[in-house]
Amino acid sequence: MTTIVSVRRNNQVVIAGDGQVSLGNTVMKGNAKKVRRLYHNKVLAGFAGGTADAFTLFERFEAKLEMHQGHLLRSAVELAKDWRTDRMLRKLEALLVVADAETSLIITGNGDVVQPEHDLVAIGSGGNYAQAAALALLQNTELSALEIAEKSLTIAADICVFTNQFKTIEELNY
């Protein structure tokens, strides 16, 4: 699987992800980029789950962003509705983390759109490890969002066998 973590602090939001692609117990690729910028570089997005499924969802989400002039929450809700009702989309297995200058969200295949506590999101096989590390760093240090995301992803990769040390990190400063 993978690990994606998003941290927001001091007018900065960051989404970071590792690069491991696994097929069962085999590592197929170690440098996949699972984090990207969307909608004129104003939205960050990361995925965990099936790679082909995630790319389909990225395309659909970007279309929703265009349709709704970049309004993140409305686009996420519309994608989640489609994901729940469309027969093809219902079979996709992936989670998305999306963020803009104001909001961070998790979009699930069940049609849920969740705004997390503490401006912190972590998903994937190492998500719990990354979230615990990031929360501890948020509460006990003055590190930047970028530093917290990077350190928490490193900790997750040290613990989770489905997460590696290759990192893709995108940040928005606002």
From Swiss-Prot:
Task: Say which domain of life the source belongs to.
Answer: Bacteria
Catalytic residue positions? T2
Q: Which reaction does it catalyse?
A: ATP-dependent cleavage of peptide bonds with broad specificity
**Enzyme Commission number, as recorded:** 3.4.25.2
Which one of the record's GO molecular function terms can you name?
threonine-type endopeptidase activity
Signal peptide positions (record): none
| Activity regulation description | Allosterically activated by HslU binding.
Alphabetical list of InterPro entries matching this protein = ATP-dep_Prtase_HsIV_su, Ntn_hydrolases_N, Proteasome_sua/b, Proteasome_suB-type
Where does this protein reside within or beyond the cell? Cytoplasm
Under the heading Gene3D superfamilies, the entry gives: Glutamine Phosphoribosylpyrophosphate, subunit 1, domain 1
List, alphabetically, the HAMAP family matched.
Answer: HslV
Its quaternary structure? A double ring-shaped homohexamer of HslV is capped on each side by a ring-shaped HslU homohexamer. The assembly of the HslU/HslV complex is dependent on binding of ATP.
Q: What does this protein do?
A: Protease subunit of a proteasome-like degradation complex believed to be a general protein degrading machinery.
Question: What is this protein's record name?
Answer: ATP-dependent protease subunit HslV
Q: Which gene encodes it?
A: hslV
